[in-house]
Amino acid sequence: MPPRRVALVTGSGKKRVGSVVADALARRGYAVAVHYRTSAAEAEETAGALRALGAEVGTFPADLADEKAVRAMVRDVLGRFGRIDVLVNCAAVWKSKPLEAVTAADVRLHFDTNALGTFLCAQQAGLAMAGQAEGGVIVNVGDWAEVRPYLGYAAYFPSKGAVTAITRCLAVELAHRNPAVRVNAILPGPVMLPPELTDEEKQGAVRGTLVKREGSPGNIAQAVLSFLDNDFVTGVCLPVDGGRTVYAPE
């Protein structure tokens, strides 16, 4: 009987993209490690919903900018489940601020979670995967607009731009240690638009796609599953953006 597959999904405690990805993996038969930073009650609610699907679930707190905390989280997941087959890095910070008001602290905040947190989780989980004969799959989450940033997010977009470099670098590093470890990234377009956006801004985001609609967390979950299914894909940073990357509306 093959070993039970285990997925660690960061940022899956809150009802956002991470929890939808966790749901999709649970429906695929994965045991799921739900990560959260401070939202313990929401993480337990997410875990309860996954258990109702028949999945084995654990909740694991960690500040992803803290190397010791990430090491401890990965160690705890391995201690609970015995292995990690999939890591999906969904945890993110996204704050709008005009350039004149951006401080070094703002930049550090975004890089700590979006770049450093992604790296540390992929490093630690990836090295664990490299020690498994079956390897494993890491899926990071960047942002389509790293190539065409827009106003108001000067601290955010650079931190997400780092995710593509991290993805390609760790695809090379981990494959060198075990060719069965693959690392890819998803670059979402307008999915779960921030509530602080005005209706005009939301409509503009939709007009900027070729499909003329907002994406859903389910679209991101589908992309994650496609990376799991195709074992000849690694080092790829895939826009899931309704054509936003290639379209320049007037």
Which residue stretches match the model-derived regions?
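Conserved NAD(P)H cofactor-binding loop of Rossmann-fold oxidoreductase domains
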Residues: C90-K95, G243
